């Protein structure tokens, strides 16, 4: 039966169209060090250019580099550095604790003096990915690709409904086994596997 499911999924036209092609990056890229606990090291990015859905057009993607878990937060517009800090505190820090390191791109939210001051205040380093090598924030870029493919599949018939489906995309990512850890992000964080869809 497992083989039949894999064959069915591989033949699904919507799924095939939704997946991105992947190529190896050029040049020597070294992986970031493996953190010692969940949510101590985080990567974040914004996904923009989405159709307006329930008043939202932006997604803040936050990835735990230890468990590979993600938080996906829909927003009406790109937030300021201070608004970003408030969102990250509300959705991540207050639940999982303060991080030691935050990796992000060089967007104005993350390269501002406000963001740097907030990171210093909580005792975290703010690491900016190279402008010429966005792969240095590769875990978040990978989650972005997976999330976009999942959303395309979920909203193929109504693209403007992505905001309502975003929690399902987050759940799907967090309960599926991650190849680097051999566990689902959920299991890696909490020690048990939640039920999959009935």
Regions found by a protein language model. Give the residues of each.
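Integrase module of LTR retroelements
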Residues: 1-198
């Amino acid at each position: 039966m497992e083989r039949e499911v894999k064959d069915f999924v591989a033949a699904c036209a919507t799924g095939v169209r939704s997946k991105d092609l992947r190529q190896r990056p050029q040049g020597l890229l070294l992986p970031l060090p493996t953190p010692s606990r969940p949510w101590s090291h985080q990567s974040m990015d914004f996904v923009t250019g989405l159709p307006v859905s329930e008043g939202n057009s932006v997604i803040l993607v936050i990835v735990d580099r230890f468990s590979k878990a993600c938080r996906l937060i829909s927003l009406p517009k790109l937030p300021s550095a201070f608004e970003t800090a408030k969102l990250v505190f509300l959705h991540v820090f207050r639940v999982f604790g303060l991080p030691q390191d935050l990796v992000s791109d060089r967007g104005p939210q993350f390269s501002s003096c406000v963001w740097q001051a907030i990171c210093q205040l909580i005792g975290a380093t703010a690491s900016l990915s190279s402008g010429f090598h966005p792969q240095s924030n590769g875990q978040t870029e990978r989650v972005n690709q997976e999330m976009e493919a999942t959303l395309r599949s979920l909203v193929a018939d109504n693209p403007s409904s992505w905001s309502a489906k975003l929690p399902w995309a987050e759940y799907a990512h967090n309960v599926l086994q991650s190849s680097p850890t051999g566990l689902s992000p959920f299991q890696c964080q909490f020690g048990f596997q939640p039920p999959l869809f009935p």
